[in-house]
Amino acid sequence: MAAGGFLTRAFDTMLKESGGKKFPDLQKAIQAYQDGSKVVTQAAPSSIVESSQAEGGGEKTGVEADEPQKVTSAEVAQQASQSKSETINVSLANAGHTLGGAEVELVLKPLRLAFETKNLKIFDAALDCLHKLIAYDHLEGDPGLDGGKNSAPFTDILNMVCSCVDNSSPDSTVLQVLKVLLTAVASGKFKVHGEPLLGVIRVCYNIALNSKSPINQATSKAMLTQMISIVFRRMETDIVSASSTVSQEEHVSGDTSSPKNEEITAADENEKEMTLGDALTQAKDTTLASVEELHTLVGGADIKGLEAALDKAVHLEDGKKIKRGIELESMSIGQRDALLVFRTLCKMGMKEDSDEVTTKTRILSLELLQGMLEGVSHSFTKNFHFIDSVKAYLSYALLRASVSQSSVIFQYASGIFSVLLLRFRDSLKGEIGIFFPIIVLRSLDNSECPNDQKMGVLRMLEKVCKDPQMLVDVYVNYDCDLEAPNLFERMVTTLSKIAQGSQSADPNPAMASQTASVKGSSLQCLVNVLKSLVDWEKIRREAENSTRNANEDSASTGEPIETKSREDVPSNFEKAKAHKSTMEAAISEFNRNSVKGVEYLIANKLVERNPASVAQFLRSTSSLSKVMIGDYLGQHEEFPLAVMHAYVDSMKFSEMKFHSAIREFLKGFRLPGEAQKIDRIMEKFAERYCADNPGLFKNADTAYVLAYAVIMLNTDAHNPMVWPKMSKSDFTRMNATNDPEDCAPTELLEEIYDSIVQEEIKLKDDDTMKKLSSQRPGGEERGGLVSILNLGLPKRISAADAKSETEDIVRKTQEIFRKHGVKRGVFHTVEQVDIIRPMVEAVGWPLLAAFSVTMEVGDNKPRILLCMEGFKAGIHIAYVLGMDTMRYAFLTSLVRFTFLHAPKEMRSKNVEALRILLGLCDSEPDTLQDTWNAVLECVSRLEFIISTPGIAATVMHGSNQISRDGVVQSLKELAGRPAEQVFVNSVKLPSESVVEFFTALCGVSAEELKQSPARVFSLQKLVEISYYNIARIRMVWARIWSVLAEHFVSAGSHHDEKIAMYAIDSLRQLGMKYLERAELTNFTFQNDILKPFVIIMRNTQSQTIRSLIVDCIVQMIKSKVGSIKSGWRSVFMIFTAAADDEVESIVEKSFENVEQVILEHFDQVIGDCFMDCVNCLIRFANNKASDRISLKAIALLRICEDRLAEGLIPGGVLKPVDGNEDETFDVTEHYWFPMLAGLSDLTSDYRPEVRNCALEVLFDLLNERGNKFSTPFWESIFHRILFPIFDHVSHAGKESLISSGDVKFRETSIHSLQLLCNLFNTFYKEVCFMLPPLLSLLLDCAKKSDQTVVSISLGALVHLIEVGGHQFSEGDWDMLLKSIRDASYTTQPLELLNALSFDNPKKNLVLAGDIEADASDSPRVDRNPDDIKDNGKVSAQASPRIGTHGTSLESGIPPKADGSEGRPSSSGRAQKDVDDVNLQRSQTFGQRFMDNLFLRNLTSQPKSSVAEVTVPSSPYKHEDPTEPDSREEESPALGAIRGKCITQLLLLGAINSIQQKYWSNLKTPQKIAIMDILFSFIEFASSYNSYSNLRTRMNHIPTERPPLNLLRQELEGTTIYLDVLQKTTSGLADDASNSEDRLEGAAEEKLVSFCEQVLKETSDLQSTLGETTNMDVHRVLELRSPVIVKVLEGMCFMNNTIFRKHMREFYPLLTRLVCCEQMEIRGALANLFKAQLKPLLQQ
C-alpha cells in the first residue's frame, strides 16, 4: 500500500466536494497536509520519526494559528511541514504504526472540519478515513480518560462522529458511523473510556431505537452487544492487576473492603453453625438483623415500596464513595468502564415512564443486559467485589422489570433472572433469595397472572431446571438454610399444582389453549427437574467411584481423610433441612397456641428451658405472630411470667425519651386484650425504664401510670370510633396525683401528648403484614419473604394506608442500604451424591401427584408422554437412592394407568403407560423388585385381552372404530417382542431380583390357574424363564427352585388333568435339562429338582397323573441314567409311593424299572441313595397288589445285600452316628440296617408266603454275614430288628392267633423263635451279652395269658437251652435260673387262693403273701424276685398286686380226655351261702362256677407236646365238656388263671430239661437254686391241694365231681424235685469236695424233710380216717394218692445210707400207711419196703 494512500484519497475526495469557496478552512487544512507530503527526503525513517517525536510536543497547536501568521513565517512552516509529512508517510505506510501528537492533529483537523460541513459525501469520506486510521492502529490514545494520551482530540473527534447522526441521516451514513464507533471501541490502541464510551453507546441506542431501517436497527443492536462484550472482556483482563492494586490499597488504607472479606471468611469458617441454624438462639449482629428486616419489609409491602427502597439505594451509589464493593478510585480503567456501562444499562432499564420510547429503551437495555450477563466469562461471575458494586442497580432494574405490565419486559426480567440463577447464584445468594419468589413463585401462584407471563416464567424454568447443579445449589442454600425460604420445594410444589389444575371448560378457545400450554410447560419443568436429578446422580456417582478407586490406589493418607470429610457434607445439610422443618412446625404451632408452641420448641431442643433463651427467641424470630407473642408475655403462670421479665430486661431504654421507649417496647408484640395482662407487662416496663433512667421519675409507680395513660391516649387518638378526643389538658389531669412530687413534669406530658397524637404507636410490622400473618396457613416457610407470593393480590384498606406503608418501607430500606446493604452470605456447593435423597424426599410426592393427575384427567399426547418420562425418571431415581416406598408408589401408579384391568376404559394414554412399563422391564428391570407381581399380572392381562376376541372387542368401548383398531393394534405389538423381553431379560436380573421375579410369576400363574377356564400363560413362561436361568449358580438356582417347586406341585395337583399333565411334563423337561449338568458328591440339587414329582405322586388322586409321573421318571432314567446322582433319592421315593398304589399296572411298571435299575445300574445307586433303594424295595415287598412282586422285591433285597457284602458300596460315605464307636466299627453296617429292618417288618405280613420268605431271608442273611457285624450292631439288630418280630406275640391278648384260626401264623411264630434261638446259639460268643433281653422276651411271653404265646415262648426257651446250653457261662446260668424263678413267682395263680378265701393251718407250707384282689383282677403280678428266700418260700413282704386284662386270650391247651364234668349254671349273680359255717367267707355262684371249671381243666390229661407230664387218672370220671359254648362262657379272669396254671407246668418242663441235660454243668449254687425253684412250685400247689382246702371245696361242688386242685402241678414238681434230690444224693462219698458236701448235705436235708412232710400229712389223714368214716377224707386221699405214690416210689431209690440214717423218722410214718385203703399207696409202700427194708433185714 502506498504511504498514506487511503488518507490522500479521502482528502482528495473532500477537496473535490469542497471546490470553490465552500469550506475554506477544510481546504486549507487538507492543502497543508498535501503540501507537506510532496517533499520526500532520503533521511532514515528512524531519524525522521525521532525528529518528529521530538518536535511534536511544541508544534501541537501550530495548525490552529491564523493564516497571516503562517505567511510571515512561511519558511519555518514549510520546513516543519516537510518533516511531519515525511513522518506521517512512514507511519501510514504500515498498519500498527501510530502517529505522534502533532501528526495526529495534522490528520484529525481536516476530519473535524469535514464533520462540520454537514455534507454527506464529505461525511462519508471522513468517516471512512477515520475508520481506517483506527482500524490500522494509527491512532493511539485514551479518549475519555483524564490525563490520558490524546484524550482531548480523540474525545472531540468521537463526539463529532456521534453528533453527525440524526433521524434524517441516510442509512449509509448511519452504517458508516456505526462502523467507526465499533472500530473505536474495539481498537486495542484507540481505547474509549468514560463519557465518550457512554456517548458511543447512547448513539447506538438511538439508532437501534429510532432508525426506520430494520437493517440499521439490527446492526446497531449487534454492535451494542459487541461493544458491551468488548468492554467487559477488557475488564476481565484487568482483574489480576486491579486485584493486586486493590489489595495493596486495602493493606495501606484499611478501607471497608477488608472487613467485608474478614466477614466472609468468618462466615466460611462457621459454615456448619450457620447452616444448622444455631445462630437463631444467639444474639444477632446488626447486619443479620437488617437483612431479615429487609425481608420482612419486602414480604409485607407491595412492589412499589421495594422499588422506592432500591431506588434510594441506587442514588446513594452515584457518588464517588461507595460503601461496599470497590471504590472508584481503586478501580482499574477497565473496571470503571464496565461499571459505567453496567450502571447505564441498568438505569436505562429502570425508567418508569410507560411511553413507547421508554418501553423500547427498557426492552433494549434489558436485552443487552441479559446478553452481557450471558456472555461474560466464568471468572467474572466470581468477581464478588465488582458484583457487589453493581448489584443494587441490577436488583432495581430487575425488580422494575419483574413488575412491569409489559409482557416483553417481564420476559427479559425472567431471562436475566435465569442467567443469575445459572451463573451468578454464588455471588448473588441474597438477591436470588428475594427475586425467586417475586419473579417465579409470585407469577405461578397468582391465579390472575396473565398466561403469557406464566409461560415466560415456565419457559425460563424449563431452561434452568435442566441444570442439575443449579437445582442442588438452590436446595442446599435455601431449603436447607434456616434463614431462607424453601425455594426448591415451593417451586416444585407450585409447578405440581399448576400441572394438576382443573380442566375448566373455557369458552374462549385461545384462553383454553394458553391454559393447556401452561400445564404442559409446567409438566415439562417437573420432568426436567427429575431428569436433572437423575443426570446429576449418575455423574456424581461415577465421579465418586473414580475418586474412591483413585484413593484406594493412592498411598497418601491425607486424601482418604479429605474424602471422608466431604462425605459428611450431605448429612449435615440433611440435618439442617430437618432442623428447619422442625423450626417451621414449631413456629406454626406457636402462631396457633403460644403456650403449646413454646413447649414444642423446648421439647425439640430448639431453645433451652430457661426464660432468657425463650425471650431471645421471641425477640429475634420475625415470623412469630406479634399477637401471640403478646398473648404469651401476658400469661400469669410462673414460666411465661419469667419469660416476660427476661424479655423486658433484655431491652435497653437508657437516655431514651419516654414516648420513644414505649414505642420501641411495643414494636415487637401486640398488647393482649385483658387488662390484667396489660397491667403486668406495663408494670415491668415501668420498672425497667426507671432502672435505665434513674432520677427521671420519683418512683416506678409514676412511670407505670404514665405508661398506662400513653396506651389509653394512643387508642383514643387513633381510633375513629372514639369521640370526643382526649385533649392535652385531659391527658395531663389523667397523670396528676395528690402529691405533686410524684407527678411527671407537665412539659414531659405535653411532649408525650404531641408525639402520640402526631404519630401512632405501631408494631414493627405494618397493617398489611399483620393481616397476612393472621391469614397465613400453618406450615409455611419461616420469614416474611414468603408473603411476596401474595403480592399479586394486595390487601389494603385505603390509599392512605398504602402510601404510609410505602413511605415506611422506603425509609427503612434506604437506611439498610446506606449502612449495610444485603449480605451476600455463604454459598454452599455440594458435589456428594447423597444430597439427592432429601431433595427427592421433599418433592417426590408432588411430582407423583402431578404425573398421576395428568394421566388421570387428560388425554393430551404431549403431556402424556411427559408424564411417562417423569414416571420413568422417578422410578429410576427412587431405585438408585434406595427409596423403596416412593419407587413402589411410582411403579404402582404406572401399573394402574395401564387400565388392563378395565379394557373398556382403555385409551391411547394407557397404551403409552404400558409401553413405558414394558420398556422399564427391558432397560431397568432392577427397579421393579417388589412390584414384579403387578407387572407380570399386566403382561398376563395383556395376553388374555389379545388372545380373547371377545375381550379385545370391548377395548376402548364407545370410541370410533379407527381409534379402537389403533389401540388394539398397539396392544398386539406390545404383546409381541416387548412383552416377551420381560421374560427374556430375566437372565439379566441380579440374584435377589430374579428370585422376586420367579416368586411374582408363580403368584400370577396361581391366579391364572384359579380362573375358569384356567390359563397356563404364566405357567408356560415359568418353564421358559427356567430354561433361561438354569445356568445360574447353584445357590441362586436352589432359591429359585424352592419357589418353582411349590408352584409346580400346586399346578400338578390341579383338578383339571390337562393342566396337571402340562405341569408334570414341564417338570420333566426341566428335570431332563438340569440333569445335563454334572453334580458333584454330597450335593442334592438333583434331588430338589425331582422332589415335586414325589409330592404330587403322594397327594394326587388321579390315576392318570400317577401313571404319567411314573412314565416321566422312567424316561428320565432311561435317557439320563448316567447323570443321576442325588436324584436317585427322589426317583426311589416316587417308586416307593407307586408301590402303595391300588392300580396294579402302576405298581408293576414301577417295579420293573426298580428291578432294572438294581440289576443293571446298581453302581449308580450306591452311597446316599442306597437306603432309599432299600426302602423302596421294602415298600414293594409290602404291596397289596401282587404277591409275585412282593417275593421278587425280597429277592432284590437279598441281591442288594450281596452287592453290599461284595464291597460295591464305598466305605466312609456315611459316618457313624455315634462318634465314640469302636475303631473297628464297620461303616457299611449303616447300609445293612434298613434291609434288616424291612425284612423284620415283612415277617408280620398277613401273607404266609411273603412272611416265610422274609423270615428265611432275614435269618439267612444274619447267619451268613453275622460274623462281620460289630457288637454294637448286633445289639441294634436284636433290639430293633429281631425282638420287634415278636411284638405281636408278646402283646397277644384274648383274641389270640388260635381264635382266628391262623395256625400257620402260630407255626411261623414258633419257627421265628427257634430261628432266633439258633441264631443266638450260632453267634453265642458275639451275642452272649444279649442273653438277658432274650430271656426277658421269652419269659415275658411266658407270663402272658394267651396259652399259645406261653407255649411258643417256653418251647423256644427249652429249645434254646437244649441247643445252646453247653455254651452257657456260669453267669448265663445264673441269669437263666433267676429269670425262671421270677417267671415262676409271677405266674403263680394267686387268684385261686383269694377266690376261695381260706386259711392254711400248716404254717410251714402256707403262702404268706396277702391277697389283695379278687378273681376278676389281672393275672399280672409285680413281684420282686429278691423276695424269694433260699428255702424257696415266699417272704411275708411279698404282696403281689393283681390287675385284670380285659383282652386275655383263651388257652390253647386242649382238655384231657379223661377229665369230665357237668355244665354249670350260667348265672353270675352273687349269692351268700349262709348255711355253710365251715367257710370263712361266703362264695358266690360265679366263684363256684370258676372252681368247677378249673377242676375240669386242671385235672385233665394234656396232649400238648410241650409238657410231657403224666398224671394218673382220677378215680372220679367226669364227662368231657366238649360243648362248643363251654369256652365261650369262660370269663377273662378264668382264662388268665388257667393260663398261669399251664405256664407253671411249662416252666416245670423247662427246669426238667435243664436238670436232665446240663445238671453236671451247673455249679452248686445253681443246683440249689433249681431245688428252691422246684420246691416253690410244690409248695404253692400243695398249699392249694391241702386237706383242709380240698375238703372246703368239696362242700361246694356236687359229690360226683372232684374239687378244684393243682394236683398235676404238684405231681410234676414232686417228680422233678425228687429226681433232682436223688440225683444229688445218690453219689455220697467220703472224698467229695467241700462244695459238693455242702450240696449233698442240703439235698439230703431237703429230701428227708420233703418225704417226711408228705408221709406225715398222709399218715395224719390215715389216722383221721381210722377214727371217722368221713367221706371227705377218702376223697382227699384219693385225689392226693398220685403224689403220695410218687414220693413213696422216690424213696425206693433213696440212697441207702440216707434212708438208714433217717429210718427212725420214716418208719412210724410208713407203718401208718399199711392200712391205707388206696391200693396205689399200698402198692408203692410194698415196693418201698422191698427196696429199702429188705436189705436191712438181710443185714
From Swiss-Prot:
The modification N-acetylalanine is found at residue 2. GO terms for biological process: auxin-activated signaling pathway; defense response to bacterium; endocytosis; immune response; innate immune response; intracellular protein transport; regulation of ARF protein signal transduction; regulation of auxin polar transport. Residues 44-82, 243-262, 543-571, 1415-1477, 1504-1532 are annotated as: Disordered. Inhibited by brefeldin A. Ubiquitinated. One of its GO terms (molecular function) is guanyl-nucleotide exchange factor activity. Residues 57-69, 1417-1432, 1516-1525 have a biased composition (Basic and acidic residues). Keywords: Acetylation, Auxin signaling pathway, Cytoplasm, Endocytosis, Endosome, Golgi apparatus, Guanine-nucleotide releasing factor, Host-virus interaction, Immunity, Innate immunity, Membrane, Protein transport, Transport, Ubl conjugation. It is a peripheral membrane protein. Disruption phenotype: Inhibited trafficking at the trans-Golgi-network/early endosome (TGN/EE) leading to an increased accumulation of PIN2 in agglomerated intracellular compartments leading to an altered auxin gradient and subsequent growth defects (e.g. disrupted roots architecture and shoot growth). Increased susceptibility to Pseudomonas syringae infection. Displays growth and polarity defects. Homodimer. Interacts with hopM1. Interacts with HLB1. This is Brefeldin A-inhibited guanine nucleotide-exchange protein 5. It comes from Arabidopsis thaliana. The lineage of its organism: Eukaryota, Viridiplantae, Streptophyta, Embryophyta, Tracheophyta.
